[in-house]
Every structure is written in C-alpha cells, then in structure tokens.
Amino acid sequence: MVIEHLSDLPSESIDAPVAESEQAGWRFMRRLAEEWASGANRFDGAGEAFFAALIGGRVIGVCGLNVDPYTVAQGVGRVRHLYVLSAYRRLGVGQQLVGRVIEAARARFDILRLSTQNPAAQLYERLGFRRCVGAADCTHLMELR
C-alpha cells in the first residue's frame, strides 16, 4: 500500500468508496465526488491537501485537509472525508491517512479540527485529538503548535 498526495481525482477512482459508503448510509463520499467534479472543493487552497491510500493503483481509502470553513479564525485546518473501504479497516490505513494529513497541516495550521459521528472518533483520539466542547461544528481538535 502507498499513500499518495493527489491533485487529480478521476471520478471512477472513487466509485467503490462512494458506493460502499452510501450502502452504509453515509453521503459524505458522494459529496466529495460532487464537490471535486464541480470544482467547489479540490483541496487546492493554501495549505490544503488530499491523500489516497492505493493498492495496485486502486483507491482503498482517502482523507483530505482543508482550511476550516466553519471558523473565521486564522490557522485552523479541518480533516475532511476520511473513508477506508471496509475490507481494509483495522489495518492501519486510516491511521496512515490521518497521519499524512497531520503532517501536512503542521506546515500551515496551528489547530486541526474535525467532526465525526461514527466509530472513527476512537481513531482520532488514539492519534492525539481531543474532544471539542461547546462547538456545534467540531467534535475533535488537535493543537499543532
């Protein structure tokens, strides 16, 4: 498996993650595909990045880094769209993807935030994120500096 920084995301490359996530009742992967296709979010702003985990050229997981759109504070990044195909979960793929996002975020951001409503919360906490209190748009954060 390799983790690559992507600047292009052909829609067919994430068909499997989009389909699997929708079967599980999650729409965020569909939103990722639509926003990339429309140009609304291609993770190409200052300090932003998008990573994919690949096996044999096949995307098995993704995770992105954006400037946090939910705050006006400077120096705040946001972890976006972490998804790993179910067959590859609990193998460290998500940990490696988020690790690359954290590494990229350290170059530009002071704080990294995210929002999750699923079991990935435990992964984020193991990686050093702590729970946000009193913020509707944030469940976890990490101070980078």
Put a short name on every predicted segment.
Residues 80, 85, 89, 117:
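Residue-level recognition of the GNAT/N-acetyltransferase active site
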Residues 105-117:
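Conserved GNAT acetyl-CoA-binding A-motif
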Residues 1-38:
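Short amphipathic alpha-helix that is part of the acyltransferase structural core
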Residues 35-36, 63-66, 109, 134-141:
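Membrane-topology and secretion signals of cell-surface/extracellular proteins
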Residues 40-52, 78:
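A short helix-loop-beta-strand connector motif used in the catalytic cores of GNAT acetyltransferases and
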Residues 88, 92-100:
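Conserved acetyl-CoA pyrophosphate-binding loop and the N-cap/start of the following alpha-helix
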Residues 52, 58-68, 78, 83:
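Conserved beta-strand in the GNAT
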Residues 113-115, 125, 130-145:
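Conserved catalytic-core motifs of GNAT/GCN5-like acyltransferases
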